[in-house]
Amino acid sequence: MKTRIGVFFGGRSTEHEISVLSALQAINAFNKDKYEITPIYITKQGKWFSGKALLDVSNYKNMEALQKVCEEVYMIPEYGDYNLYKKHKPMFGSAVLTTLDVVIPVLHGSNGEDGIFEGVLETIGIPYAGCNTLASANGMDKITMKMVMQSSGIPIVDYVWFTDKQWYTQREKLIAEIEEKIGYPVIVKPANLGSSVGISHADNREELIAKVEVAEQYSTRIVIEDMVEDLKEINCSVLGDCDDYRPSVCEEPIKSGDILTYEDKYMGGSKSAKGMQASQKRIPADLCPEDTERIQFLAGETFRVLSCHGVARIDFIIDRKTGKIYVNEINTIPGSLSFYLWEASGIPFDKLMDTLMNLALKRKRESGMKTVSYDQNIFNLGKGIKGGKTGIK
């Protein structure tokens, strides 16, 4: 019997289209002799749809027409109910479209990669691939991520963070702190977005103020980082769980300017988006053996201290002047699932998907061994509860 996989993608996110591309790549990679795949597309308005038409990327040009030929679906947040239901129940026949065995979220950015969707899956209790709620939330929030890494001895660049309200009430104080602790130039980032969305750099106070206003359009919390001017960017993926993980080969993305942009990552110099694998890169990266070993070690440590699971990609900065290596950030659901890094490491895409499914089922088995509730009902203990007939105080 085939394992029934639900692939969720799209979502209420600025990285919506990239999620679609990553998901279609993953769906195509699954061994259809072993798996029965159900695509579940989440619109930008948060509605869920399923249907074969979702498998053709050209259909996404006309969303209204696409939704008309697909089935609107939903799941019930009830533990143990793995059914995918039809929203518009037929007069005759089953209201259940299919029953899932495992879910793989291929959702990038907000409302999917940040722990929110993972929390829904935890509530249902269905096995799923990738990071859990805690790791996803920590990985998405750049501030929390930096705090965890810094406390664990993982090297990161100097930074300052603040909320949008603090910026309006304490602007001069914050600017003074930034100029004293970091100095220009700086990188300005929204705290909770990926794919380089909303990121820019500032060379002076005037530019800083303008760039913070841009970042505020995407997040209520802003991060200001020391900008390494003469840098080399390196990425390394990690596959496994906290007990058993391995790093991939390293890659060096090729950027068109000071910052690796959304276009650099996903357009690859072409006029049409093709996913993360389309970006221009060197694989393996041009590194000395010592730097390669150091980056792979730090990638694994970052994966471990953030309690990651499945496949993730850790992005690094090397200061060419000093040779220092810094962890920039982690992507807990990386673009294209970093399959191109694993192919270069000797693991084909279909085997990568096998590994993710096996890891999901392993975690479910292990979590089932933990105590989450007691069979004993304390309401039957009588004297153990204050209040008696009048209720609990």
Range-by-range predicted roles:
Residues T3, F9-R12, D286-K393:
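ATP-dependent carboxylate activation and anion-phosphoryl transfer catalytic cores
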Residues T3-F9, S13-T14, V20-N28, G93-L97, ...:
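Active-site nucleotide/adenylate-binding loops and adjacent lid/helix of ATP-dependent enzymes
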Residues T43-G46, G240-D243, D319-T322:
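Short acidic-glycine loop/turn motifs at beta-strand connectors
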Residues I37, P127-Y128, I156, V186, ...:
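Hydrophobic beta-strand scaffold residues
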